[in-house]
Design a protein with these regions (language model features):
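PLD-like (HKD) phosphodiesterase/transphosphatidyltransferase domain
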Residues: 5-10, 167-216, 319-339, 474-513, ...
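Conserved P-loop NTPase-based nucleic-acid remodeling module centered on helicase motor cores
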Residues: 31-141, 147
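Accessory N-terminal region flanking or inserted into the helicase ATPase core
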Residues: 2-6, 14, 101-203, 210, ...
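ATPase/helicase motor core of nucleic-acid motors
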Residues: 55, 70, 104-106, 339-349, ...
Length: 573
């Protein structure tokens, strides 16, 4: 049982050194398990790097995992049966339902619950409470230090009520992703996979309390735990003074791991130091090496180009100012095209990093399209504006609002109702002219005429009205029942979607976008039906037998859809 750190600057080769060490040891000890734990988003790349580093081009006794994947591996091995894991969409649904029941008791949150995205923010706060071990006692202790007249006091009081209701609902039913690692920590001692293994942690800037508790258990059963730490040679990694010093996160991580190792009875080995005057990554780039060394330091050192560098330096750092994001994106696209044409770069060698990708995404996509640059946007897109989602939301709104003019034509304009644009225009003009609104008026035959409506036109409009009313009649009857459960509404909506062949219509839209070369939209429509069906499954499994008003169901649906995102995969993967 031991703990060892690999220390070095950014670009000094910590990961390379670690992977080579792991590969070499794994070949010498094929009977031993080697686990490389990295953040979730780096697991695939780490697997590729390890395979590339291995002389045989493959890894047999080495696994690259995230903490969550490790949990599933261990649970599968030890046969531990735990409650189902509640994901973020499920949390949103449960919190929205609990907050709705507590609405009259909430002072601050009450007026914000219906705002788009607010439930997701409350969910994030509760998730962080669980992740960082903030229980009700700690929350109460903190609130005691606040004035009872302060806004923060009442806001925390509301969050505590929702948090308490959330915990009560989950008890003996579900566990959250944040609690998975606590469950894993209890299972570590039963795992043969972990006993005597070598565990490496790479790419982390710090660990949450629940991760520290897990690492403590891993130290007790493994042969060795190795951790890479990004830190400068001028800093002492074993002394953490305050959170505002340089490399504070790294120092905090090292000191907390050292204490954890001591408490677990593990030896702290001498650290491997990969300090170099110029980190390996920047050996051909003195400007970047200087920036890495001096950024955020209070020295007055300035970079001065040496004579022998005048020809080799490429102007690695440059600053440019433009009028708006669109001009910025165009400049970036021009620069990328120049690098590819004149300096033999490949598109996959280039990354564009934006402080707010949502602000720049459209401008970058258009600029890259203009210059014929293939681009992959690494961000998730909300499905709230998808036509199928709008079809679903407007369908329920139409029933809840009793066929108001706005709700009816919001639904018809989604393009998925089976009417042509010309037919919808004619219906809309007639309804506007004669103030047709309310379900009763849509059920009754239309007999009044406008100056431009002839007998044949009126007959055709009534034919369209009958088609629309008859197709929605069964669903509307269920939705208007006074007593109905979440299961009743969900089943009725699902059967209506099947009746209207929405899955086939969405597949046709996906093909249309593919034929047009709009691959991002094609990917979105390929996923959206499945996402909504999975959300319906969560409705039934989490809240199925609860009675619910249609208005509350609409809000519940919005809360679930807020968290639902579609994401495209990088073509390289």
């Amino acid at each position: 049982m031991s703990l060892q750190f690999i220390l070095g600057n950014s670009g000094s080769g910590k990961s390379h050194y670690l992977y080579q060490q792991i590969v070499n040891e794994s070949m010498e000890h094929p009977e031993k398990n080697y686990l490389v734990l990295v953040p979730e988003q780096f697991t695939m790349q780490t697997q590729r790097d390890l395979c590339a580093a291995h002389p045989r081009g493959g890894i047999m006794n080495i696994d690259a995992l995230s903490f969550m994947r490790l949990a599933y591996r261990v649970f599968e091995e030890v046969g531990r049966e735990e409650q189902p894991v509640l994901d973020d969409e499920g949390k949103n649904l449960v919190i929205r339902r609990i907050a709705g029941k507590l609405e009259d008791d909430l002072k601050v949150l009450k007026g914000n619950l219906k705002k788009q995205g607010y439930i997701s923010e409350v969910k994030s706060v509760i998730s962080e409470f669980v992740q960082y071990g903030v229980d009700f006692d700690k929350l109460d202790d903190f609130m005691e230090g606040l004035s009872q007249e302060s806004y923060l006091y009442y806001k925390l009081q509301d969050i505590r009520k929702v948090y308490e209701g959330f915990e009560e609902y989950l008890r003996d039913r579900y566990i959250t992703k944040e609690e998975m690692l606590d469950v894993l920590a209890r299972a570590v001692c039963d795992s043969e996979l972990l006993k005597g293994s070598v565990i490496a942690l790479d790419g982390f800037t710090g660990f949450t309390p629940v991760q520290i508790r897990l690492i403590s258990e891993l130290l007790k059963v493994s042969e060795k735990v190795i951790v890479t730490v990004e830190i400068d040679r001028r800093e002492d990694p074993f002394i953490y003074r305050h959170p505002y010093q340089l490399f504070a996160l790294s120092k905090q991580m090292v000191t907390s791991l050292v204490k954890t190792a001591q408490d677990a009875g593990a030896e702290v080995e001498e650290s491997v130091c990969l300090y170099e005057k110029v980190p390996y990554r920047f050996r051909e780039n003195p400007e970047m090496a200087f920036l890495e060394s001096e950024l955020f330091r209070y020295s007055r050192r300035q970079y001065k180009k040496k004579k022998e560098e005048s020809e080799t330096c490429s102007g690695a750092i440059s600053l440019h100012e433009t009028k708006n994001p669109r001009e910025e994106a165009r400049y970036v696209a021009e620069s990328i095209r120049k690098l590819v044409r004149e300096k033999d770069y490949r598109y996959r060698d280039i990354a564009v990093i934006a402080a707010d990708l949502n602000l720049y995404a459209d401008a970058l996509e258009k600029a890259c399209e203009l210059f014929e640059i293939p681009v992959f946007m690494d961000h998730k897109k909300s499905i709230l504006l998808n036509s199928f989602v709008e079809y679903l939301r407007s369908l329920l709104a139409m029933a809840e609002q009793n066929f108001t003019y706005e709700s009816v034509f919001r639904h018809l304009r989604t393009g998925l109702c089976g009417f042509t644009d010309e037919e919808i225009d004619r219906l809309e003009n007639y309804c506007l002219a004669l103030d047709i609104k309310g379900y009763k008026k849509w059920q009754q035959a239309w007999v009044r005429r406008t100056p431009s409506t002839g007998e044949k036109e009126l007959e055709e409009l009534n034919h369209l009205r009958v088609i629309f009313v008859e197709k929605t009649m069964g669903l509307i009857q269920v939705l208007k029942q006074k007593k109905k459960t979440v299961r009743d509404v969900t089943q009725a909506v699902y059967e209506y979607l099947v009746q209207e062949k929405l899955q086939q219509k969405i597949a046709q839209l996906e093909k249309k976008f593919q034929d047009r070369g709009e691959l991002a939209l094609a990917k979105e429509y390929a996923q959206v039906y499945r996402i909504v069906m999975e959300l319906f499954d969560k409705f039934v499994s989490l809240l199925g037998e609860e009675e619910i008003a249609l208005k509350d169901y609409c809000e519940l649906l919005d809360a679930g859809l807020e968290e639902a995102k579609v994401r495209s995969l990088d073509k390289q993967l």
